[in-house]
Amino acid sequence: MALRPARCYRTTERRSYTRKEYVRAVPQPKVVHYVMGNSSVEFPVEVQLISKSDILIRHNALESSRIAGNKYILRECGRTGYLFNIRVYPHEILRENKMAAGAGADRISDGMRLSFGKAVGTAAKVKKGQEIITIGVNPEKFYAAKEALRRCSMKLPTACKIVVTKGQDLIRD
């Protein structure tokens, strides 16, 4: 069955659902790596991608964002010239009450009886002003980090802003 659109799970009004011991099978998050690049070096410039609204970000959106940003920053800075860090983890469990469609579906379907749903994925609950991704680089690669975060934000379901949190005085305009 196809993946339900993200707009079905985007809002954060509903209560959190994170207790894995009550759920039979929770799908593993698609995010493979949370820290990429050179983690042994302290970089002088740090740039962050910050959410502008409260939202749930699905694990596949986080993974596609990670791939897009990491691919660009790796090409620009090399393997040891950056630190890419995803700051959120998809704890929220997303459920779906699957409905049969087509001819004769009314005989097969249970409708809204036992409509709790099965776990179909996970999502990260992000608040307004929370950091989603952080990139650390040297001052000469600041614009590459900024472009990588812009590419990351294109894959996420919320408006984001890019903020320099460390090393503002080292950046030349």
Curated annotation (Swiss-Prot):
<dbReference type="InterPro" id="IPR016180">
    <property type="entry name" value="Ribosomal_uL16_dom"/>
</dbReference>
<dbReference type="GO" id="GO:1990904">
    <property type="term" value="C:ribonucleoprotein complex"/>
</dbReference>
<dbReference type="InterPro" id="IPR022981">
    <property type="entry name" value="Ribosomal_uL16_arc"/>
</dbReference>
<dbReference type="GO" id="GO:0006412">
    <property type="term" value="P:translation"/>
</dbReference>
<keyword id="KW-0689">Ribosomal protein</keyword>
<dbReference type="Pfam" id="PF00252">
    <property type="entry name" value="Ribosomal_L16"/>
</dbReference>
<dbReference type="InterPro" id="IPR001197">
    <property type="entry name" value="Ribosomal_uL16_euk_arch"/>
</dbReference>
<keyword id="KW-0687">Ribonucleoprotein</keyword>
<dbReference type="InterPro" id="IPR047873">
    <property type="entry name" value="Ribosomal_uL16"/>
</dbReference>
<dbReference type="InterPro" id="IPR018255">
    <property type="entry name" value="Ribosomal_uL16_CS_euk_arc"/>
</dbReference>
<comment type="similarity">
    <text>Belongs to the universal ribosomal protein uL16 family.</text>
</comment>
<protein>
    <recommendedName>
        <fullName>Large ribosomal subunit protein uL16</fullName>
    </recommendedName>
</protein>
<dbReference type="GO" id="GO:0005840">
    <property type="term" value="C:ribosome"/>
</dbReference>
<dbReference type="InterPro" id="IPR036920">
    <property type="entry name" value="Ribosomal_uL16_sf"/>
</dbReference>
<dbReference type="GO" id="GO:0003735">
    <property type="term" value="F:structural constituent of ribosome"/>
</dbReference>
